[in-house]
Amino acid sequence: MNRNVFAVLALSARFLCAQQQVYIEPPHDSGQGVTPAYEGWFPNSDGSFSILFGYYNRNQKQELDIPIGPDNHIDPGGPDQGQPTHFLTRRRWGMFTVTVPKDFGGKKLTWTLVANGKTAQVPVGLDPLWELNPFKDASGDTPPFIGFTQAGPFVNGPRGQTQALSGNASNPVPLNIWVADDASVIPGATRPRTPAVTLTWSKFRGPGDVTFASDRPPIESTPESARVQGAPNPVFSGKASTTATFSEPGEYVLNVLANDWTGDGGRGFQCCWSNAQVRVSIKK
């Protein structure tokens, strides 16, 4: 190649790289918005459909509380359709579902969020290209099952189940979870040394601060003779316990996320993890 041509190309490449670096926005600890995320949809056994949502809080450190209303609404049918009002930092996959009827057809829902003065919206529907199977991936892996007692019932997948508890602001509230999983390994991968299931607790809604004794409590594996009942053929099962302390009275919703070895967001394939929620009524 002619040296002059090579020099021009090299300078052009350096210029393009410099230009790209100029427009790369650095991460921000705070002051950024929250973007709703449409993960997809899946059919339910009764003929209805579940639309799965997550979000992306673009702040590295700032968690946000956005009450239901003008700054946090899903319409039509809203403003409240079960969405979070507390937003953890960064990307959060498949945090909740909205159920729509079997005749929903080509209609749309729109989730609107206003955070730090920045508005973001996502319109969602039942586009066939966005159909999911959050209960089994291509390798046959299934999400962990979650129960609130050792006897169950046990439910898996993003819709989950709900428990109601009560307490007061001066005493920690005990939180106990039983899990069961098929301990499926990604084909061709080495069996991980980490536990087959990991749990993460977080505040989903509520007026005050929530402090967990451990938001990622270890799961104590149960012996085969004491394994949970009601979850199909568990290879791994166990119990995890923690407590939550609430800064003030009010109605709270806590979320517990159970991940298997596929990790957050199921490597982008929307399987295999499970959610469950605990509604806690806190008195003085």
Where on the chain are the PLM-derived regions?
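Boundary at the C-terminal end of the N-terminal hydrophobic targeting segment
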Residues: 18-20
